[in-house]
């Protein structure tokens, strides 16, 4: 079996160089890989189903939660959802509607907490389909459909503010190593609480 962790390069194109493409698929882990349970399993059209089954079993044995996609799509599932939200967040910052701090607060103090318990689809079921349809009709036409990075992101790139690695992005990071350490510590705590609550 040959697997790629990429979610940005087209898997069918990578498989063109292989003698046995039926043994190839994507196994997309998420950072930090030792903590995030989900791993996307992405077969191409020629992937043998037994390779998918073997990969799913291996990941489960490693304590992961494998999720098999039916076919490759650019970015796979998690990054498509993540970047749909990031695109809207960048637009709100670029339009002066919200600050980066406010965007992150909405996620860490509201949506992230709710979605850690119930995903967006089950949250929709809980709220009810009729209100979801009404809100979608109202909001969808005004959501960002930008097909290129918003200026606020391009300006960070051009100014050399590349994020934690350079000590500054949307925020300043006087101690870059502490950012990942804090993230890992808090993620471990959240995962422990969720595991205990689910029994």
Walk through the language-model features, giving the residues of each.
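Short glycine-/small-residue-rich flexible loop motifs, especially phosphate/cofactor-binding loops
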Residues: 12, 56, 89-90, 105, ...
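NAD(P)-dependent Rossmann-like dehydrogenase/reductase catalytic/cofactor-binding core
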Residues: 64-67, 95, 100-199
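Structural/interface elements that position substrates and couple domains in central-metabolism enzymes
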Residues: 78, 82-88
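Rossmann-fold dinucleotide-binding core
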Residues: 4-80
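AAA+ ATPase "lid" subdomain C-terminal helix
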Residues: 83, 93-95
């Amino acid at each position: 079996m040959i697997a790629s962790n990429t979610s940005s390069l087209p898997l069918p194109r990578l498989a063109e160089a292989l003698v046995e493409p039926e043994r190839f698929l994507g196994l997309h882990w998420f950072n930090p890989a030792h903590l995030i349970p989900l791993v996307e399993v992405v077969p191409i059209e020629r992937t043998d189903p037994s390779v998918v089954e073997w990969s799913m079993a291996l990941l489960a044995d490693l304590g992961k939660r494998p999720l098999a996609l039916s076919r490759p799509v650019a970015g796979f599932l998690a990054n498509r959802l993540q970047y749909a939200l990031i695109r809207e967040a960048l637009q709100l910052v670029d339009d002066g509607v919200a600050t980066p701090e406010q965007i992150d607060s909405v996620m860490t103090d509201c949506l992230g907490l709710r979605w850690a318990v119930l995903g967006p689809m089950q949250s929709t079921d809980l709220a009810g389909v009729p209100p979801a349809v009404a809100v979608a009709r109202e909001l969808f036409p005004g959501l960002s459909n930008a097909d290129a990075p918003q200026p606020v992101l391009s300006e960070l790139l051009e100014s050399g503010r590349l994020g934690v690695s350079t000590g500054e992005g949307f925020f300043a990071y006087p101690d870059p190593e502490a950012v990942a350490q804090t993230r890992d510590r808090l993620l471990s705590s959240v995962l422990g609480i969720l595991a205990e609550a689910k029994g």
